Amino acid sequence: NILEKGTTNGTISDVDGNFTIAVSSPKAVLLIKYIGYKDVEKAVSPMMKIVMEEDSEMLEDVVVIGYGSVKKSDATGSVTAIKPDDFNKGLRTTAQDALVGKVPGVNVVASSGAPGAGATIRIRSGASLSASNDPLIVVDGVPVDNSTIEGGGNVIGGINPNDIETFTVLKDASATAIYGSRASNGVIVITTKKGSDSNLRFNYSTNLSVSTITEKLDVLSADEFREFVPTVSGVPGSVTLGTASTDWQDEIYRTAFGQEHNFSVSGKVKKNAPYRLSVGYNNQNGVVKTNNYERFTFNGGISPKFFDNHLTVDLNVKVSYEDNQKVDESVVNNALRYDPTRPVMTGSATGADEPGLGYFIWMNGNSPMAIQTDNPVAQLELQDLHNKVTRSIGNAAINYKVHRLEDLQLNANLGYDVLKSKYTKNVPDMAGMMYTSNMKDGTGLVYDSKQNKRNYLLDLYANYAHVFNEKHNFSAMAGYGWQHFWKKFDATTLSPEGKELFSPNHYESEYYLLSFYGRLNYSYDNRYMITATLRSDASSRFAKDNRWGLFPSVALGWKISQEAFLRDSEVLSDLKLRLSYGQTGQQDILNDYPYMTTFTVSYPESCYQFGDKWYYTYRPNGYDSDIKWETTETYNIGLDYGFLNNRIYGSVDYYQRHTKDLLNTINVISGTNYSSVITTNIGEMDNKGVEFAINAVPVHTKNWKWTVGMNYTWNDSEITKLNVIDSDANFVQTGAISGTGKTVQVFMVGQRPYTFYLAKQAYDDDGKPMEGQYVQPDGSISATETKYATDKSALPTSYLGFNTQLTYKNWDFAISGHGAFGNYVYNYVAADQYVQSVYSDQGNFSNILRRTKDSGFQNQQLYSDYFLEKGNFFRIDNISLGYTFQKLWNSSSSLRLTFGVQNVATFTSYSGIDPEIYSGIDKEVYPRPRVFSLSANLNF
């Protein structure tokens, strides 16, 4: 930026540094500014040569930490900040899309490929078992509610990625302990864009996209099915297959189109009130027919200053509305199974007054079969599933620099997070799926649920900072926090005619958090640093005697590169050692009242029928009056480095984490509690890992710039205690597949979380699996389905991210990708199939995978480790090519055009569609699409 000093007259240079400016006087002075370089003031002349000097201090990112900010070079904890230039390129429907593969120690896995879908985010693999492992997410100073909503949803789905200025990830206890009770799993601080002191600026961006599926499951074609079925033993010779040739996967998938538009305006009111307003619209069709995601967003902020800049009021409000026309994800699995010799329609008119409404369904005489796979096309066309979410997050942050004692700042932050959701499911009478549901008589339904959540907070804190004798830098912070969470749920189920089919469902709950916290920072001569924090939290989820938890931390830092023996090094430009220890707490469990007796509305499948109406029952919850905080201790040693004037820079961290008093769900002896399952403090878990990040600028000339970045994480977790008496037979089952009590994973002492627990498949001399034969612990082979801990977990032992960008003048080309290794995937799609499943005793048929035919398994082998596969993969996430037009009609206008491809390619040995499944159980969810996009970004 080039400004005429003392005026608002200015311009910007082109990519080569050339500029022209008309000044008001021959004696004018130009002020030249550029990020990462020291400001230059120079008297104007007709021809000017200006050389700017890099500013190493300015190059240091300022990172946001709890209740304050700090230069990255002064941070003693494990903290990573990424900014818009670092975000993944291409279409970013949700905020978490920008984080994939970007931060060491952070694993982001989308829950499905549906537009607007949520994601599982894990920092250092999580610290708990039965309690939440989600990180705390703080948006502009407001810790947001991350509990789920009915019908699915995305915790931060209402935040427009285009409004985000930075993500700051806090990983070790020194960085997170200031958040105390909710920080055991790390913290992600989202800071949105603010106004600036510059002149009025406008930005418009748009993105047009086309999405396609990358691969279909390999099932038998109609002709192959007609040829194979008669060879299956037990199939009566009198049965007749259909004459159609239907590719059911083709029938449910489509090429999907999407569009996104964003507009923002920023500037200042008079001289002391910068502001920014933005609106956004996103409309994305899913690759599964009828699926659509639509979002409207508004983000507004203004930061007026008063009393000679001593008082700053920062007002922020974010409002979003999401309308998600969902699909029942079972349609993907049903398309795999449905008989390919049957037509989509029966030949009758659509909507015909007959069972199925014109869509093919299996009939037993004149009555639909009660047990059958639903017609996937009918599921899409006849079911109307909508999830509408309105959310607003906002706060008023007040900062007062005390007059005549400006080193002391008083702060108040009042915030809120309010959410309203409405989930509806409408199915007409006589739709095929209404003959296989609870009603089984073809009666349609109108299901309507409403959920309300309110989260209010108040933070009052003071900051004091002073430099003594130019070498002693001291700062302190102390504060008080209060937060209230409330939620309510109501649901009704009616027939299309308005008749009540189920009794109404209602619940309401709340909890409070109360906190006192403080932090001390001291550094000497910009070389030696110490940070200490202390936080005391009370949670209403625990009884009075166990309500308070105390969470301390301490961290040391040493800037080795500032020592005399390295200060003048031409090779080493930065070297800082970090050491930290701290404790954090956990109280995020499903029940807000786990220490007292409560009753919960039953599941729909546990309803009972009285007359023609179904009634919900109430079941007692198990409780533990002595339940208390889960506590995690973390040790961290880290090294930040830079070489060749930071042309090469990065960090290395090693951490050890120990969680005790695990909030764990365990079985208890019947009769000793209201339930045979309770949540209590029992168990311990160890977690350790290494994180490595390196960034380099191999080429940086006048016209060329090439940057490369990579991060790698290794992590290992082990459960060290789980029950009162730990033994091989005393473990917690998890990893449900289908049906009551069917699980394939365990929590077991000596194992990693989510270790697969299966029977060891026996093979013949040719390496072919022997049906119904398993290897026993003594090495013998028998038909006994003896399960064992496989030592193979759904959790990766390592994962990495990679990105590179090449810039030539106004052109830029970028590639990014990520991968995970050491994890295993249970292919339930394949395990749930067997040769005999092609025909049922009722007389209906189901398709199978080609591999099922080849394996020859006649009967279901759900617990065979034959279906457990390596889940290693590396995915090229994004490739983009862009061009920027400078100075379109004035010096401050620019236009950037970008073409991008997402989900470019996945390299894996996994036999299913996609190995990236956080649970490690492949139930054939909505596939991730490949997306082609064209975007434009206009600034003026």
Language-model segment annotations:
Residues 32, 137, 522, 747, ...:
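Short aromatic-centered micro-motifs
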Residues 793-826:
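Glycine-rich, aromatic-lined ligand/substrate-binding cores of catalytic
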Residues 218-220, 427-429, 493, 725-726, ...:
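Short Gly/aromatic-enriched secondary-structure transition segments
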Residues 1-306, 311-320, 362, 393-394, ...:
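Short, small/polar-rich motifs associated with maturation and membrane association
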Residues 237-239, 249, 377, 818-902:
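Extracytoplasmic gating/loop element in the C-terminal half of outer-membrane beta-barrel translocons
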Residues 87, 134, 226, 236, ...:
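Extracellular/periplasmic, surface-exposed regions of secreted and cell-surface proteins
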Residues 203-243, 593, 680, 697-794, ...:
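Conserved small-residue
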